Amino acid sequence: CVLEKSAEIGGHILSGNVFQTTALDELIPDWKEKDAPVKVEVKKDLLKFLVNEKLSFSIPSFLMPTMQNHGNYIISLGNLCRWLSEQAEALGVDVFPGFPAAEIIYKDDRVAGVITGDMGVDAEGNPKDSFQPGMEIIANEATVFAEGCRGHLGKELIKKFSLDKGKDPQHYGIGFKEIWEVDNDLHEEGLVMHTNGWPLPNDTPG
């Protein structure tokens, strides 16, 4: 089964994406016939260096061959996740949106599953009339954690099993996501634009 803390699958995935279909071709070879939300093929890549908020100049594409996306698609990751959940459910996978994993179940010092969060509690964590305790989900073979690099269960696992012993320290960056609605006259379908420079200072790459 799959547990998703968001109220709907893909609800926390606000990212657009330039998508290479290799893995999807292997996983679901007939994804086009199944109307996957992978429609807009990349037609052109532009590379821009931003000097400031008004001035930029183009970088020849041959200087950065890894930035070329011929044959790839421009997609919404959230929409793709929703579609993948439908394919999984059609195969008999139980998908539970709105059920975050809250605790780890251990058996013989191994991960055996998780317990979902309690439902029907107030802001202070006190049970309301609609209270329902979390459910135990026991895995048949394996439990896969996909909660991000600093999830609370991940931190518990790292500490318990010394997963960071002898490893380089993790590094983090802060990212901000926004969804913009752009007038059709102001964008070109199939265009991928890569930028660097402003607003970052010269001594900060990105």
Predicted features along the sequence, with ranges:
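Residues forming the flavin
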Residues: 1-55, 60-206
